């Protein structure tokens, strides 16, 4: 991992809950990442999660079936339109969902907000998310980091998922890493195989350091 420097400041209960936005194209692994984060962090932190889908609450259902968190701690939002709009230009539906969840769980440490699948231009409103994690996957080809877009260049953390598929799609992970550094500069990134839990600990370390979390 191209990791951030540790912070000397720690988040306390006096600060509002940390809001972590997770975005990325359809099928990149956003829901899988959210599941793994919840399962790994739920014993140390008070967590709630909000998922976005256009016409259904499928990701909420998947997380519930997987046992990521108790059912009442996962809220599904049906955006009814462009996923990008619901997290950026008009985030009111998600801001309302955050308020509702925090009314139920006022001691929450982290609110995870998973966007619906979108393109490389998707970004979270700063009113909605304190930290943004953008997920792409190797199956899209090694060219993906070079394509740029705010998700790749401006997210707080870029996750390059499905590294195990690199030999199958002819992707060179070293090239992807080099291109990622060129596009992101000093901004951190992690290469993951989420199904095997590879890289999950690095994502958690990033959230804890940048989010000023304390246990």
Swiss-Prot record:
Sequence positions that bind GTP: 24-31
GO CC annotations, alphabetized: cytoplasm
CDD domains assigned: UreG (cd05540)
Subcellular location: Cytoplasm
An individual GO BP term: urea catabolic process
Assigned keywords, A-Z: Chaperone, Cytoplasm, GTP-binding, Nickel insertion, Nucleotide-binding
Molecular function terms from GO: GTP binding; GTPase activity; nickel cation binding
Superkingdom of the source species: Bacteria
InterPro entries: CobW/HypB/UreG_nucleotide-bd, P-loop_NTPase, UreG
Xref: Pfam families: cobW
NCBIfam families: ureG
Stated role: Facilitates the functional incorporation of the urease nickel metallocenter. This process requires GTP hydrolysis, probably effectuated by UreG.
Subunit-structure text: Homodimer. UreD, UreF and UreG form a complex that acts as a GTP-hydrolysis-dependent molecular chaperone, activating the urease apoprotein by helping to assemble the nickel containing metallocenter of UreC. The UreE protein probably delivers the nickel.
Family: Belongs to the SIMIBI class G3E GTPase family. UreG subfamily.
Annotated protein name in UniProt: Urease accessory protein UreG
